[in-house]
């Protein structure tokens, strides 16, 4: 018999029934998340079955190097391999994927990787070091017509060599503290060099990888599916026959989880949604919860007035009561923590005592709003009206965050309207600067300043800087922290970077997220991590029959 917690509400008088249901939901949510209880009946992996899971919206295109949203990662990750990857069971440890072994030189400026032999693309062609080089050349030096969102993360790389078909060597112009983690980025899908030579934009519209699952179809507006790659280089994997992604709203996903139509949604549910599902489905579900390397940000288009004036940007950031926002939004969204540019609780995070001295983070909202009004008057801006561009088809947390911001601006006399776009339109607006102010996403796969601060580096160096700003002081600090080998010195540089960035307020954090994943209790082999991007190739997961 399975060792599962009993969480079903007992019968009782009507006046006590509601209370018991709420206690039952809490019981399940807590017990199922405890080590040794959740998954206590798991055994050796079993083969077979198709995993159905939900994604809120469809990807705008298929290119890993150009995208930054989970709607792309969750559907394409099973088709691709990366050089390294994170071991989610022992996060943040890094493990090999295509790399069988690797070596870092004593000066940390040369990284040598030995690749697994006999790795095949899904068209039967053999992967070699040339494919790795071509993929990273595309990331570091994207050709015309190709967008490499995380290009700034790899500024240290000066050259890539392929001395033989199974060896690739990266040379750096300076030692980068985050480089090994960057080689494990889930976004660095390895593409076919031959296909890229024919058409550098091939990955935008086609799927051809070496991952555990072969692409089957994308039926727009309905689903995405993949099947097991029988020639996958990791012997015995994957365990699943395939997977099927249903493109449905978060609300529909809650009902689908309750009915058993889907087995997972890998991004997050809200606390209230979790309680509803556990109340309805009880111990058929497993709940996992943890910190999240993601926050909602507010980006201002610095190339257009009035947001080319830092005083105006800072005023609109000062108007926002972030501390009050956590209380208002924590239960109906997963917006939970106030923090700066580094995840609250992480090693490089700014302590609260220092954070509250930075513009926009004070607990004295009355004083902050008085300063906001003063700055607007000083800048000569009156009767300000702002269109806030936002994401429509992934409503949580974007919609509530946008409404919250607009309400906060009204407190200083700024009127705003909400422009709601599809993910594809929203992403295009951010990339092309077709907005005045926008709700933006800051989501990463690892807590490291080189990765986390790249979106604040000048736009000509970092395409992920949606504000379009140029700030050579931040650029210098960014390189300075990356090459620093002294932890205390690096932390000081990061603090200076953070204070300058939130004062200039081209892009500012709103609230950090808390991840809450609900899945079928029969779904095994998957571990929650602080990022919704890693651990999604599905090579290790299986379904208990």
Where in this protein do the model-derived segments appear?
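N-terminal lobe/hinge region of extracytoplasmic solute-binding protein
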Residues: 54-106, 137, 206-210
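Extracytoplasmic/peripheral linker and loop segments enriched in polar/acidic and small residues
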Residues: 365, 415-426, 451-521, 545
């Amino acid at each position: 018999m399975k060792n599962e917690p009993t969480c079903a509400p007992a019968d009782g008088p009507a006046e006590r029934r509601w209370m018991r249901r709420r206690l039952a939901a809490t019981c399940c949510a807590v017990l199922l998340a405890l080590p040794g209880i959740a998954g206590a009946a798991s055994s050796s992996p079993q083969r077979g079955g198709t995993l159905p899971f939900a994604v809120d919206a469809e990807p705008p295109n298929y290119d890993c190097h150009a995208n930054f949203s989970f709607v792309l990662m969750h559907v394409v990750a099973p088709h691709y391999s990366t050089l390294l990857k994170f071991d989610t069971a022992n996060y943040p440890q890094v493990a090999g994927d295509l790399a069988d072994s690797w070596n870092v030189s004593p000066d940390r400026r040369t990284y040598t990787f030995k690749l697994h032999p006999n790795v095949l693309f899904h068209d039967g062609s053999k992967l070699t070091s040339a494919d790795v080089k071509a993929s990273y050349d595309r990331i570091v030096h994207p050709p015309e017509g190709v967008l490499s969102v995380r290009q700034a993360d790899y500024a240290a790389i000066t050259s890539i060599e392929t001395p033989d078909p199974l060896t690739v060597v990266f040379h750096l112009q300076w030692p980068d503290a985050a480089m090994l983690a960057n080689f494990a980025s889930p976004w660095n899908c390895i593409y076919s060099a031959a296909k890229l030579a024919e058409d550098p934009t091939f990955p935008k519209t086609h799927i051809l990888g070496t991952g555990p699952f072969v692409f089957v179809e994308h039926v727009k507006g309905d689903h995405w599916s993949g099947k097991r790659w029988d020639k996958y280089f990791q012997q015995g994997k994957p365990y699943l026959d395939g997977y099927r992604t249903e493109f449905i709203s978060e609300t529909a996903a809650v009902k689908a989880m309750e009915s058993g139509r889907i087995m997972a949604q890998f991004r997050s549910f809200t606390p209230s949604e979790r309680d509803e599902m556990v109340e309805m489905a009880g111990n058929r579900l497993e709940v996992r919860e943890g910190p999240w390397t993601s926050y909602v940000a507010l980006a201002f288009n610095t190339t257009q007035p009035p947001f080319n004036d830092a005083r105006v940007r800072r005023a609109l950031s000062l108007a926002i009561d972030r501390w009050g926002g956590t209380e208002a939004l924590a239960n109906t969204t997963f917006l939970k923590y106030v923090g700066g540019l580094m995840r609250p609780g992480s090693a490089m995070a700014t302590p609260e005592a220092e954070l509250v001295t930075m513009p926009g983070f004070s607990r004295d909202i009355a004083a902050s709003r008085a300063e906001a009004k003063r700055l607007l008057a000083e800048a000569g801006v009156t009767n300000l009206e702002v269109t806030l561009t936002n994401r429509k088809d992934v409503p949580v947390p974007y919609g509530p965050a946008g409404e919250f911001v607009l309400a906060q601006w009204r407190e200083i006399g700024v009127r705003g309207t909400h422009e709601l776009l599809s993910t594809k339109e929203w992403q295009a607006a951010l990339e092309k600067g077709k907005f005045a102010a926008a709700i933006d996403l800051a989501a990463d796969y690892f807590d490291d300043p080189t990765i986390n601060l790249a979106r604040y580096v000048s736009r000509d160096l970092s395409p992920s800087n949606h504000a379009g700003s140029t700030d050579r002081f931040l650029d210098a600090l960014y390189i300075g922290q990356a090459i620093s080998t002294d932890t205390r010195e690096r932390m000081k540089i990061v603090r200076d970077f953070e204070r300058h960035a939130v004062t200039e307020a081209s892009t500012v954090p709103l609230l950090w997220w808390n991840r809450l994943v609900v899945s079928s209790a029969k779904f095994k082999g998957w571990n929650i991590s602080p990022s919704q991007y890693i651990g999604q190739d599905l090579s290790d997961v299986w379904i208990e029959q």
